[in-house]
């Protein structure tokens, strides 16, 4: 099943130059036979050879021996899927895991409203504002900004509640013990 490409090759050279001996295309013949007959491990192989007579001598690359050659590619079209054990052992990037683990960021609006009943007015009002800003950022699609503002609203709400409890306890103690 030999392919006679010498005549096409001479046409590509334009009839000038040194014609190659007949055994110079052994590699191409072997690769063509191997790709036509074999299918290894359920994977299909591809092989492409472009031989056209429109190519001029300038388009052909030189291989260091004043003989032009053409590039040939052989590669896999399909690959076998990884086994489940290999997939589970693979380490994913931190951005991919954080996006999957954390869904919709929380705005802590209920906690901020609850903190408004504590007597630390500037802190709990700022927590309420940050919670509303977190909700607006989430509606605009800015997940990172919504997450950051939500965490800040949670921190300020907790601080407001704790300071409010401290103020309430001090007021009760001052009214009962010191009077």
Swiss-Prot record:
This is Trafficking regulator of GLUT4 1. The chain crosses the membrane at residues 158-178. Residues 1-47 are annotated as: Disordered. It is a single-pass membrane protein. Residues 179 are extracellular. One of its GO terms (biological process) is protein localization to plasma membrane. It comes from Xenopus tropicalis (Western clawed frog). Belongs to the CD225/Dispanin family. It comes from the Eukaryota. Regulates insulin-mediated adipose tissue glucose uptake and transport by modulation of SLC2A4 recycling.
